[in-house]
Amino acid sequence: MPRVELEIPEDVDAEQDHLDITVEGDNGSVTRRLWYPDIDVSVDGDTVVIESDEDNAKTMSTIGTFQSHIENMFHGVTEGWEYGMEVFYSHFPMQVNVEGDEVVIENFLGEKAPRRAQIRGDTDVQIDGESVLLNGPDKEAVGQTAGDIEQLTRVKDKDTRVFQDGVYIVEKPGAGGA
């Protein structure tokens, strides 16, 4: 019977509501649904317990995946996740702004209509000149927001060796929250 116990860090609260695990800390809170047949995830005092009655390879790999998700949640609510992006342009100076819950890119390749990307979850976007900094407690929301912004400025139907304009990810967290 495989069983994994994860210690809940200090200054972090974890709660279970049926299939959802909520982790709260200084940087905010993250809720995630963790469900797979024959795998039980529970909060027991100061530990999160992942256990199963099955012992096959698929169940073991899913237990490892759940363990990584919970560790990422702990890291997010204590230290947070941070992505760095840079604005590059050579022909037309583009402006990048935050309007409400959207990132707005104006004058990309001289276009008249602005391009917009949704800011996901509790992601905080800070723009300082030509650098864009994204941070937040949810690894997936921060990473998806960064990816959406990068895809928003993808150059189509032009020679990408000449048209290198865009907003590119230049710094992202490595494996294990490094």
Where are the language model's segments positioned?
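Ribosome-associated RNA-binding proteins
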Residues: 1-178
